[in-house]
């Protein structure tokens, strides 16, 4: 696909930076170092090692871009990352450079972040519970991600989605896939890769406010914010946000987590537990994976002198505040296909504390048996075992 786009570049000189050249279709091209003639006009090829960790990847990518930009021979640079690399890592290279006023910010900007999606397999992929290792795609022994998790993340965090092999599926399937992409990432433009002229034109088009970095607001985040830019719900498709102020009972919620959630393709948001009332947890789910993480303390449990003081933060906090619970709340956005959202939300509602349980007070809540606490401790122990420090 990149070959086709490059063919439409006109007289511009492009550089191509590959994440891993060893298994690439251009592996047989001769050349040494960070510069190589691939096409008749003399593009550039540089290679990044696939095995590097996220920090090393960012450092290697920054160094490679600085090297190529320093040649001052090219008008544009295309970076092709491994499918195992999270798109947010590539974006962070430029966003951090802008925020920290690093040299890279003065030499290059990120115009587009493109995710290439295989139209013939993406529907099966977002519904898959297969671990990456089962597909021969694992990034290492510690890579426990599943296919649906990686695929959804890459779709959510891009500015353009190139739909490859769209001609391989019928019209109804193609429309369903495009609808899925627009639910997951309503801000991204969906391009049919078969139209290489249009694809090249869009990739060449500068992104608005590119000098300010790139940000993402996936469909789940827009749902929580009340943004109406997502496609309308239909008989098959459903979207909604489960909202509540009361805390979850840890054991009832754990049992709910362990049950099947048929039809739910994406669920993400934040929640709190009666047994850990100061902690804010994130919830992240695809059709093939479901996990939670402690991400910090609620502001009501944080000394006020430590709060940010900007007006936008204070306005938002005020809109979320209740007298009884402060900013603590349940907000879980769901996107489903063939999902019974009403039944699912009713199940979640039954996991909230009852009025009698609320009257027991926080001291009693903290003594509730809590499977989430045990799971958090076990996860922390595993991280300590793999920490090189």
Where do the PLM segments sit?
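Conserved strand-to-helix beginnings and helix N-cap segments that scaffold or border functional pockets
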Residues: 58, 88-91, 171-175, 254, ...
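Residue-level signature of catalytic and energy-coupling elements of molecular machines
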Residues: 80, 113, 158, 190, ...
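C-terminal accessory "lid"/substrate-recognition subdomains
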Residues: 23, 122, 131-324, 330, ...
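Nucleotide-state-sensitive switch-loop elements of NTP-binding domains
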Residues: 1-144
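Short, aromatic/basic amphipathic alpha-helical patches
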Residues: 27-39, 175-181, 346-350
């Amino acid at each position: 696909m990149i070959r086709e786009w490059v063919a439409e570049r006109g007289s511009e000189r492009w550089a191509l930076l590959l994440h891993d050249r060893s298994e690439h279709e251009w592996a047989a091209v001769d050349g040494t170092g960070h510069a190589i003639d691939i096409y008749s006009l003399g593009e550039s090829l540089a290679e990044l090692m696939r095995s590097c960790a996220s920090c090393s990847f960012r450092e290697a990518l920054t160094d490679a871009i600085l090297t190529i930009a320093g040649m001052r021979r090219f008008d544009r640079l295309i970076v092709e990352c491994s499918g195992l690399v999270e798109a947010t890592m590539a974006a962070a290279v430029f966003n951090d450079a802008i925020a920290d006023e690093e040299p890279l910010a003065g030499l290059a900007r990120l115009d587009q972040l493109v995710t290439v999606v295989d139209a013939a397999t993406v529907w099966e992929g977002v519904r898959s519970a297969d671990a990456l290792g089962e597909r021969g795609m694992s990034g290492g022994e510690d890579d426990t991600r599943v296919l649906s998790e990686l695929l959804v993340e890459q779709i959510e965090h891009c500015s353009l989605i190139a739909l490859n092999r769209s001609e391989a599926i019928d019209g109804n399937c193609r429309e369903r896939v495009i609808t899925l992409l627009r639910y997951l990432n309503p801000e991204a433009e969906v391009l049919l890769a078969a139209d290489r002229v249009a694809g090249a034109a869009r990739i060449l088009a500068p992104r608005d406010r590119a000098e300010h970095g790139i940000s993402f607001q996936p469909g789940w985040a827009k749902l929580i914010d009340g943004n109406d830019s997502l496609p309308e719900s239909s008989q098959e498709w459903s979207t909604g946000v489960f909202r509540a102020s009361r805390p979850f009972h840890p054991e009832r919620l754990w049992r709910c987590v362990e049950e099947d959630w048929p039809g739910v393709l994406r669920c993400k948001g934040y929640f709190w537990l009666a047994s850990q009332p100061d902690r804010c947890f994130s919830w992240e789910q695809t059709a093939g994976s479901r996990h939670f993480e402690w991400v910090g303390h609620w502001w009501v449990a944080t000394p006020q002198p430590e709060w940010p003081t900007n007006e936008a933060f204070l306005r938002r906090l005020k809109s979320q505040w209740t007298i009884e619970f402060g900013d603590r709340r349940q907000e879980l956005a769901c996107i489903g296909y063939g999902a019974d959202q009403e039944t699912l939300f009713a199940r979640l509602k039954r996991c909230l504390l009852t009025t009698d349980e609320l009257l027991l007070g926080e001291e009693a809540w903290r003594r509730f048996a809590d499977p989430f606490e045990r799971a958090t401790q076990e996860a922390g122990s595993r991280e300590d075992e793999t920490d090189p420090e």
